[in-house]
Design a protein with these regions (language model features):
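N-terminal active-site beta-alpha-beta segment that forms phosphate/nucleotide-binding
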Residues: 1-109
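Conserved phosphate- and dinucleotide-binding cores of soluble alpha/beta proteins
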Residues: 86-206
C-alpha cells in the first residue's frame, strides 16, 4: 500500500492533479482489493473445516479471522476455537479471542506453552494462522510462536492451513528480517514484572 501511495503521489505531481486525492483513491482501491481477496481465502479455508470441530489459531488478524468466522456461520459449521495468548503483547488473547467471542463462538485462551497438550487432549481438527509474509519460494513467516505450533500439528497429523497471498517483496526467506526487540518485554506481563531483577530476556519477533 505504501509503495503504491508513493507511485500515485508521483503521478499526481507530474500530471498536476491533487496528491491527497490520488493517495486516497489508491488506498481505497487497494483495501477493496485486499478485502475481496481475504473473503475468498476465508471461503476456501472454511471449506477445509469439519462440520463440527475444533480449530486452533494463532494471533489471527481481525479481518481474516472475522471473515473466516462469518463464512463458518454461513456454512452452518459448529466451530470451537483454542487461541494461544501470544506473548508478550497478548494479541491472541486481547484481539483474536475477542473477535471470536464477539461473533458468538466458543473460544478458549491458552498459554503459549500449551498447544501440544491441547492438541492431544482436546481433539484439535485444524490449525490455521495468517501470515505476515509468504515468500515466493514457499516459506511462510508469521509470529515466532507459530513455528512450534506448526511442528506440533505435524506431529499429531493435524492439517495446517495458512491464509494469505505470496508477497513479491519477499522472493526468498533470506529477505525476511527477524527483529530482536527489547528483551525487557519478555520479563513482564502488561507492564507488571514477572521475573527477578538480573534475569535476562530474549525477544525475537517479525
Amino acid at each position: 500500500v505504501c509503495s503504491g501511495c508513493l507511485t500515485a503521489a508521483k503521478e499526481a505531481l507530474e500530471s498536476g492533479a491533487r496528491v491527497d486525492e490520488a493517495i486516497r483513491a489508491h488506498v481505497v482501491r487497494a483495501n477493496n482489493s485486499r478485502y475481496s481477496k481475504v473473503n475468498e481465502i476465508a471461503k476456501y479455508l472454511v471449506a477445509m473445516f469439519p462440520q463440527k470441530g475444533t480449530v486452533m489459531t494463532q494471533c489471527f488478524g481481525e479481518t481474516i479471522v472475522g471473515m473466516m468466522l462469518k463464512e463458518a456461520k454461513l456454512a452452518g459449521k459448529e466451530v470451537r476455537l483454542f487461541c494461544p495468548e501470544t506473548r508478550p503483547y497478548f494479541q491472541g488473547a486481547r484481539l483474536t479471542a475477542t473477535v471470536c467471542h464477539d461473533m458468538g463462538f466458543d473460544v478458549t485462551v491458552i498459554t503459549d506453552n500449551m498447544p501440544a497438550f491441547v492438541m492431544e487432549r482436546e481433539g484439535v481438527d485444524v490449525f490455521t494462522c495468517a501470515a505476515d509474509a509468504i515468500c515466493l519460494d514457499g516459506y511462510v513467516v508469521n509470529k515466532v510462536g507459530t513455528f512450534q505450533i506448526a511442528i506440533c500439528a505435524n506431529h499429531f497429523g493435524i492439517p495446517t492451513f495458512v491464509t494469505g497471498a505470496p508477497d513479491a517483496g519477499h522472493p526468498t526467506k533470506d529477505t525476511v528480517t527477524i527483529e530482536m526487540r527489547d528483551p525487557e518485554f519478555t520479563l513482564q506481563a502488561m507492564g507488571v514484572r514477572t521475573a527477578a531483577e538480573g534475569v535476562k530476556g530474549y525477544y525475537p519477533a517479525f
